[in-house]
Amino acid sequence: MANDGYGAIRVSYSILNSWAKGDIDRAVAPYAGIEIEPTEAMEYGKKKHEAWEKEARRYGRLPRRFGGRKLISPQFELNTKKIRKLNDWCYLSGVLDVLDGDVAIDYKTGKTPAGDYLNSYQHECYQILYPNIKRFEYHCCNHHLRRKDDGYITVAVAYLNKQTLKHGIEWVLTMAAELREYLINNGYGDKLDQGKGFEK
């Protein structure tokens, strides 16, 4: 693959997840220089993430909404960005909401309960970027429910090991190879290494 005359592809979990779900437009958009208009739900999620980060920074704890657990040595979103070279044709990038020692924390909004994310590859992708993490916590707030309703707040934990790391690498390389081939075959091969429009 490295000898095909095209550059390496840089991917993130969200790009690969879009590809895996068949949302080709969203997966290809960063390489085509197309900005996808954020949905109302995405805008709401962004605002909540900003508010939760501000609260956690100020008090050194998880947001009260998620139990207020004391954080030991937290790093927040901008300080957690990582890019990792997996081979000569694939780079993986990502940003955690919170990295607290060997614990990764991801905030979610929307109707999906935390337990459903355990079936995703998200925690395995982030383990590739942060090999020292031992557990990945999903903290979810379903703003479609009232605070007192069951399911308003859900939390799920994925425990990470050598097997999850191997599984994650296999998935990333499989999805990235498919996406890279699609981009090359559809006239975007020259965009692979430019980095324009990649998630920050």
Go through each PLM region and give its residues:
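Metal-dependent nuclease catalytic cores that hydrolyze phosphodiester bonds in DNA/RNA
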Residues: 1-101
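Metal-dependent nuclease catalytic regions and adjoining charged, substrate-binding loops involved
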Residues: 6, 10-11, 73, 80-88, ...
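Short acidic (Asp/Glu) and glycine-rich catalytic loops that position anionic groups and cofactors
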Residues: 28-32, 105, 151-153
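Short loop/turn segments at secondary-structure transitions that flank enzyme active sites
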Residues: 54, 111, 142-144
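Hydrophobic/aromatic-lined pockets within catalytic cores
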Residues: 56, 109, 131
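Conserved catalytic cores of phosphodiester-cleaving nucleases, focusing on short active-site segments
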Residues: 94-112, 126
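Active-site-adjacent loop/helix micro-motif of nuclease/hydrolase catalytic cores
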Residues: 112-119
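An active-site-proximal "capping" alpha-helix that borders the catalytic cofactor pocket
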Residues: 120-131
